[in-house]
Amino acid sequence: MSRVAKAPVTIPAGVEVTLNGQELSIKGGKGSLVRSIHAGVEVTKEDNVLKFAPRDGIAGADAQAGTARALVNNMVIGVTQGFERKLQLVGVGYKASIKGNAVALALGFSHPVEHALPAGVTAECPTATEIVLRGVDKQLVGQVAADIRAYRAPEPYKGKGVRYANEQVRTKEAKKK
């Protein structure tokens, strides 16, 4: 059994977990999430603890048990604390603003870029060069951040573009004459 799957997931107070076959739904203060668990993983709920174990005779069940445990743990964290991803816009004239349910970006193109936000993700712009994305689904928040970053990824010479707040951009040296 994988080391990750051996550690149980503790359910904090105020979080409601419902296990219906291989369908797991978690409700908390920030929202609710539903996930189907792989058929090779057996989930048991005892008191305020979820335990994961691989089923015998199914190939890859050990790895799936660890993956399921990590995903469910992220669901519990999401409905209690939520997830946040910060983006920075670096470059002259690069700006961001919120227009309804979309992020409007000026990234040096001949046209403004509008990125529609999916349900479950909210955005705010504390400054014109910062975007803060929040939501309960870690994967969805990260995917939206990656999609916005992909419009203008940091270039390697000056570092201009959209980057994650904690990202270190490796810059190259300019060509010598």
Curated annotation (Swiss-Prot):
Cellular component terms per the entry's GO annotation: cytosolic large ribosomal subunit
Single annotated GO MF: rRNA binding
Lineage of origin: Bacteria, Pseudomonadati, Pseudomonadota, Gammaproteobacteria, Aeromonadales
InterPro entries assigned: Ribosomal_uL6-like, Ribosomal_uL6-like_a/b-dom_sf, Ribosomal_uL6_a/b-dom, Ribosomal_uL6_bac-type, Ribosomal_uL6_CS
Family note: Belongs to the universal ribosomal protein uL6 family.
Organism: Aeromonas hydrophila subsp. hydrophila (strain ATCC 7966 / DSM 30187 / BCRC 13018 / CCUG 14551 / JCM 1027 / KCTC 2358 / NCIMB 9240 / NCTC 8049)
Keywords tagged on the record: Ribonucleoprotein, Ribosomal protein, RNA-binding, rRNA-binding
Protein name: Large ribosomal subunit protein uL6
Gene name of the record: rplF
Function summary: This protein binds to the 23S rRNA, and is important in its secondary structure. It is located near the subunit interface in the base of the L7/L12 stalk, and near the tRNA binding site of the peptidyltransferase center.
Listed PANTHER family: 60S/50S RIBOSOMAL PROTEIN L6/L9, LARGE RIBOSOMAL SUBUNIT PROTEIN UL6M
Quaternary data: Part of the 50S ribosomal subunit.
